[in-house]
Swiss-Prot record, chain B:
One GO cellular component term noted in the UniProt record for this chain: ATP-binding cassette (ABC) transporter complex
Role this protein plays: Part of the ABC transporter complex PotABCD involved in spermidine/putrescine import. Responsible for energy coupling to the transport system.
Family assignment from sequence similarity: Belongs to the ABC transporter superfamily. Spermidine/putrescine importer (TC 3.A.1.11.1) family.
UniProt protein name: Spermidine/putrescine import ATP-binding protein PotA
Lineage, uppermost ranks: Bacteria, Bacillati, Bacillota, Bacilli, Lactobacillales
Length: 267, 370, 274
């Protein structure tokens, strides 16, 4: 009885969570032009989407910004995490962490508005550059937060051991620390990528006229009403997310398996 | 005398107001097994870390084969460490761990492979090279940590409580193996532990430490038989420590009686402490008793009975006896003069050694007949 | 580690330090600075006096906080049982992944989906017609705004609560049962207090963004609900009154700090009981 209730509750929650997504994608295959009354199957909206050169350029922009900003943010964030981890004074560490988290907890509009003031004051033109800089900026703290726990797991005696066996600072970094924290770095890069792809508000503030990302484009089209090309786009993006999640878990599985294979050798 | 391999001259270590080490002097000779023994926080690990190069000495010199190495970084010192938590690299296989130091030295692949194999054979894990660290048991990880250090062919191997995480049986086995390994390699081992049994079993020489100072050094037998003060007597082995008074050379009073003893060179009427090990006390009938005690409780320990008793003055006694006693019984205790060890308050190791010089030799003649 | 690693390594820290200075400290300083300037770039306190004297702004602020509270409350009421039941499942990590998956869909696409669902002839009205109530105006109402915002926030609440449940040592539950507590008593006296940090983290993750979801108020709320976020966006990008926008921004920052303090972990620092 209780079991039944639990199941029912979860089923309802999952239906609510997924209904809009299923609804959205289902209508991307509808022959009509609105999201009411299904009119039979068609690929038409996908054809429109893939021949919409403006949309394709925006997709390319979005991916370029996401990849570039994630790479740079991962680099800076990892170095930052290494730095924070090296601080010995508790006060310094706590205040660095607090500062690090400011952008994590700030509402998007505040980040967007303050960056807009910042770029305007420095006379940095709004467009690709300002969007890229903003994305790097709000991705750095998540990278730090993903890398730091791994660094903390690293025991001090392990670093002593590496030195004891003759490692220089550079070798310590390249042969012990980086390989050890690489799962954290990878997770950080991945999170940065999703933050970038997901962002709307910050980009909306700092993008100017000439440059647009997918989120901004969807917003302006959605304000004009229903357009099933957007449904087709969401179908493509959902598939892309699935691939990304799948890829992420696949890589994790592989590294787990590699460990297990070695472990398996014992018996 | 040969050149000592490691020397510490007046080494101190302070963090802000805390003195971790005060005026440490110690000399390690080549090819011996040394132990730093003391309770946790006594500074023994700090000594190890200053020798390894992970910690700076605040003042004093650290010499390696006669050369000052205070400013030589850890990665350039010819000593290697086996860490308490093993500190094996979890992202490398067993062989990669052992090969780590040699790889950094850019040795030829064939040489690395051979030396790694040799080291793994030495710790009896020859076939384990391809395994992940997480696939090893605690005891196996311990051996790999040793292999990783000895593959570097250090002249001194530092071991920081390496057996503390193992269960009792494995620990005993590893004691034999470590001792054996040290003798086969012929290098100096400096072993840190808080376990006095471990120290007594393995060492050529023990340094007993407390609160940042070395209290006494010497062979396990010397330290067990002639502890320099209350702390050492209490820390090493079990003991009965009683207040007493020196009557004359070889005569001491405690527990309300006067007894013959093996110590001399102490001023008459000086208050002293007397140590008697529980296994040196023998139960006897009241007629032959040197002291009379009342039995309180006893525990069967397998190879002996541990008996707790009280004498007429209220002193507690701990007795190890092969035969059981009856709770509440009055029973006699007897012991030989050389089973008593007299300790002066505040006597330093140098003073103790000097005093011993003055009457040693006479002592052996006196008790020959017993 | 001694001398060996101390030297030169601070160079690695420079990019991160620059980021802290330019993109964390400077922007916050700038938004506070900007809030003291009027449209003609003159120093003024007028923005603040306007804000605190104007019934419109104050009402907007109260409304915004009230809606954010409602959204947080509904999200919590739905999420706690979900996380709790989810945690009892066999393949819970897989199900949790399914909860997280929708957060990967762009928030604007989800909002867009609801434009379709809530439209005059949309799915929701078809359902209402089917059960006999008849079609209603759903889109561009306050209720639809709260519904969609709650929908979007649910995974962000479930996740920290689930993690808190995961951190809970099952021995505590066994101990509570062993001492004679019923299931409900165990939940109320042991499980809930110990997972409260997860709830607080969830509140942080939901409440603050709910104050500033300007795209939802535009797309779903039809500008009926004006949140602090909407007002900021309006001042910055439409009326170009950056001073006033920054003033509201400062209010939002203060609101954020209050929420963070209220829900922050109250671990007694230094062991002194409070």
């Amino acid at each position: 009885m209780k079991q039944k209730f639990t199941q029912l509750y979860l089923i309802v929650v999952f239906i609510i969570l997924y209904a809009p997504i299923v609804f959205l994608i289902a209508y991307s295959f509808s022959q009509g032009d609105t999201m009411t009354n299904y009119h039979g199957f068609t690929w038409r909206h996908y054809q429109t989407l893939f021949s919409d050169s403006r949309m394709l350029a925006i997709v390319a922009n979005t991916l370029l910004v996401a990849l570039l900003s994630s790479l740079i943010a991962t680099l800076i964030g990892t170095l930052g995490a290494l730095g924070i981890n090296r601080t010995t004074k508790r006060v310094t560490r706590e205040s660095l962490l607090t500062l690090n988290n400011v952008l994590m907890v700030s509402p998007d509009v505040i980040i967007g508005a303050s960056f807009l003031i910042f770029f305007t004051m420095l006379k940095i033109p709004l467009g690709f550059g300002s969007v890229l800089l903003s994305h790097i900026a709000f991705e750095i703290p998540i990278v730090v937060l993903m890398v730091l726990p791994r660094l903390r797991e690293m025991s001090a005696s392990m670093l002593d051991a590496a030195q004891d066996l003759g490692a220089t600072t550079r070798q310590l970094l390249s042969q012990v620390i980086i390989p050890f924290i690489s799962p954290g770095i990878f997770a950080g890069f991945f999170m940065a990528l999703t933050y970038s792809l997901d962002d709307f508000a910050v980009t909306f503030f700092v993008t100017g006229n000439g440059f647009s990302t997918l989120s901004v484009e969807i917003y302006s089209r959605a304000r004009q009403g229903i357009n099933l090309e957007i449904n087709a786009l969401s179908g493509v993006m959902f598939l892309f997310s699935l691939l990304l999640v799948g890829g992420y878990y696949w890589i994790q599985q592989v590294s787990q398996k590699r460990k297990q294979r070695k472990r398996g050798a014992i018996s | 005398m040969t050149q000592p391999i490691i020397e510490l001259h007046q080494v101190t270590k302070r963090y802000a107001d805390n003195t971790i080490l005060s005026n440490i002097n110690l000399t390690l000779e080549s090819g011996k097994f040394y132990t730093l023994l003391g309770p946790s926080g006594c500074g023994k690990t700090t000594i190890l870390r200053t020798i390894a190069g992970f910690t700076d000495a605040t003042t004093g010199d650290i010499l390696f084969a006669g050369k000052r190495i205070n400013d030589v970084p850890a990665n350039k010192r010819n000593v290697n460490t086996v860490f308490q938590d093993y500190a094996l690299f979890p992202h490398m296989t067993v062989a990669e761990n052992v090969a780590f130091g040699l790889t950094l030295q850019k040795r030829p692949k064939s040489e690395i492979a051979e030396r790694v194999n040799q080291a793994l054979r030495l710790v009896q894990l020859a076939d384990y090279g391809d395994r992940a660290i997480s696939a090893l048991s605690g005891g196996q990880q311990q051996r790999i940590a040793i292999a990783r250090a000895i593959v570097m062919q250090p002249q001194v191997l530092l071991l920081d409580e390496p057996l503390s995480a193992l269960d009792a049986k494995l620990r005993r086995q590893m004691q034999y193996e470590l001792r054996d390994l040290q003798q086969r390699l012929g290098i100096t081992f400096l072993f840190v532990t808080h376990d006095q049994e471990e120290a007594l079993a393995m060492s050529d020489e023990i340094f007993v430490m407390n609160q940042g100072e070395i209290l006494q050094s010497g062979s396990p037998v010397d330290i067990y038989d002639e502890p320099i003060n209350h702390f050492v007597a209490d820390f090493i082995g079990e003991s009965n420590i009683l207040p007493g008074k020196m009557i004359d050379d070889f005569q001491v009073a405690f527990g309300g009686h006067q007894f013959e003893c093996a110590d001399a060179g102490i001023p008459v009427n000086e208050p002293v402490e007397i140590v008697i090990r529980p296994e040196d006390l023998t139960l006897t009938d009241l007629a032959h008793a040197k002291l009379t005690v009342t039995i309180n409780t006893q525990l069967f320990r397998g190879d002996y009975y541990e008996i707790a008793a009280t004498d007429g003055l209220g002193n507690d006694w701990l007795i190890h006896s092969v035969n059981p006693a009856e709770d509440g019984d009055q029973i006699g205790l007897t012991f030989r003069p050389q089973d008593l060890h007299v300790m002066r308050f505040g006597e330093k190791e140098a003073e103790f050694d000097a005093r011993l010089e003055t009457y040693e030799g006479t002592e052996d003649d006196r008790f020959d007949e017993t | 580690m001694i001398a060996l690693t101390k030297r030169k390594t601070w160079l690695y820290f420079i990019p991160y330090g620059l980021w802290l200075a330019l993109f964390v400290i400077a922007p916050v300083a700038l938004i506070i600075y900007q809030s003291f300037f009027d449209l003609g770039h003159h120093f003024t306190l007028a923005n603040y006096s306007t804000y605190f004297a104007s019934a419109t702004y104050l009402k907007m602020t109260v409304n915004s906080v009230w809606y954010a509270l409602l959204i947080t409350l509904f999200t919590g009421l739905i999420s706690y049982p979900t996380a709790y039941f989810l945690h009892q499942l066999k393949h819970r990590q897989f199900w949790l992944l399914l909860v997280i998956l929708p957060t990967w869909i762009n928030i604007l696409l989800k909002a867009y989906a609801f434009i379709g669902i809530f439209s005059q002839a949309g799915l929701a009205n078809q359902f209402l017609t089917f059960i006999g109530i008849g079609p209603q105006q759903i889109l561009f109402t306050n209720a639809s705004f709260i519904f969609v915002a709650t929908y979007i926030q649910i995974p962000f609440m479930i996740l920290p609560i689930f993690n808190a449940l995961d951190d809970l040592n099952p021995a505590f539950i066994n101990a509570s049962r062993d001492l004679g507590a019923s299931n409900w008593q165990t939940f109320r006296r042991v499980i809930f207090p110990l997972t409260l940090p997860g709830v607080k983290a969830g509140v942080q993750a939901v409440f603050i963004p709910s104050l500033s979801l300007f795209m939802l108020t535009r797309l779903i709320g039809g500008n009926k609900v004006i949140t602090l976020g909407t007002a900021i966006e309006e001042h910055f990008l439409t009326t170009m009154n950056w001073g006033m926008g920054s003033t509201i921004g400062v209010v939002l920052i203060i609101a954020m700090i209050i929420v963070m303090t209220l829900t922050g972990d109250q671990k007694p620092k230094g062991g002194a009981p409070r």
